[in-house]
Design a protein with these regions (language model features):
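A general "terminal functional-core" signal
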Residues: 74-329
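Metal-dependent C-N hydrolase catalytic cores
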Residues: 2-137
């Protein structure tokens, strides 16, 4: 039994045929967590779809109308790069509801994971790059609307820049957006995040971890979040079909541990979303995502009693952020 909740619904798994986006990974992660003895049925919660009012805090009414009435133009559907269907829209609203619920549970338990989500390319008035609506932004805006938090941080380690995240939160001093990504990769127009880490092709474990540690240290020095949304893409993996970095599975596990340590040391609730992952073997992508959940479990174990260790419902006392141990850099 895990010390936090996992959010999942079988509808996350769309039948996309031989599309490069492996939507079956959500089901496979769920099954591996269960059958591997990492989680049991009581650890999982099924979300409700996001309400339209939640989606409309992030996306324009015209875009939402087009999505719900199947009236996107041919060009807009091409920009999504994923087959449009009513099932797709239902799954996206459900994933957004999953990230809302994950945020609520993280504030209660210290940690949570949406076994899905992380659709960081979705912009206010359009979707792109397999991302229809921006579940993380929707969750942050809902938590702010509920006055559960004021300040949030997005740590995006997907190999692709979080352009939708950057566009949605541009100029918002209450949301700190950090994106570490391959520079010469999609998207080709990259609006500025609060902190962008542009990596050249071929960066491997040691260099990546050193750079990420340096920037996380600076980010937590500059900003004191009340919740972290961790967009934990599996695609920096060296065998990823859509990436050009060279991280090993062990390097990705160290990445996860590093991010978790910053959350733990700063007593900040953290939400995992899975984001991208397109390894030649889907089993590799699944293993990386499962490893992220394991990293959260291990970090929660170091924290002791999660509810006692974390600031709940956004009532955060003044403090100086603390870096994790040097051995993780």
């Amino acid at each position: 039994m895990l010390p936090f909740k996992l959010i999942y619904d079988h509808c996350y798994d769309l039948n996309l045929g031989d599309h490069v986006f492996p939507s079956q990974k959500y089901r496979l992660v769920y099954e591996r967590l269960l059958h591997g003895g990492i989680a049991d049925n009581s650890d999982f919660l099924s979300p409700q779809p996001a309400k339209d009012e939640d989606v409309l805090r992030v996306h324009t009414p015209e875009y939402v109308r087009k999505l719900k009435t199947a009236s996107l133009s041919y060009a807009e559907i091409l920009q999504l790069e994923i087959p449009y269907s009513q099932e797709l829209i239902e799954a996206c609203w459900l994933a957004a509801g999953g990230s809302i619920l994950a945020g609520q549970r993280a504030l209660q338990d210290g940690w949570s994971a949406n076994v899905g989500g992380g659709f960081h390319h979705a912009c206010p008035d359009h979707g792109e790059g397999f991302c229809v609506i921006h579940d993380v932004a929707i969750a942050i805006r809902r938590l702010q609307f509920d006055k559960a938090i004021e300040r949030a941080m997005v740590i995006d380690t997907d190999v692709h820049h979080g352009n939708g995240t950057a566009a949605i939160f541009a100029g918002d001093k209450n949301v700190f957006t950090l994106s570490i990504h391959q520079l010469h990769n999609y998207p080709f127009v990259k609006p500025p995040s609060t902190m962008d880490i542009n990596l050249p092709n071929g960066v491997g474990d040691d260099e990546y971890l050193t750079i990420l540690d340096e920037h996380l240290r600076k980010a937590f020095s500059d900003f004191s979040p009340q919740i972290i949304f961790y967009v934990a893409g599996a695609d920096p993996y060296r065998e990823d079909q859509l990436g050009g970095l060279a991280l090993t599975m062990q390097g990705l596990a160290s990445r996860d541990a590093l991010v978790m340590d910053y959350a733990r040391k700063n007593k900040c609730p953290l939400v995992i979303t899975l984001a991208g992952g397109y390894a030649r073997r889907v089993e590799d992508t699944v293993a990386i995502h499962v490893g992220t959940i394991i990293a959260a479990r291990d970090a929660a174990g170091k924290s002791g009693s999660t509810e006692a260790q974390f600031t709940i419902r956004g009532q955060q006392s003044a403090r100086r952020p603390q870096p994790p141990p040097e051995s993780h850099s």
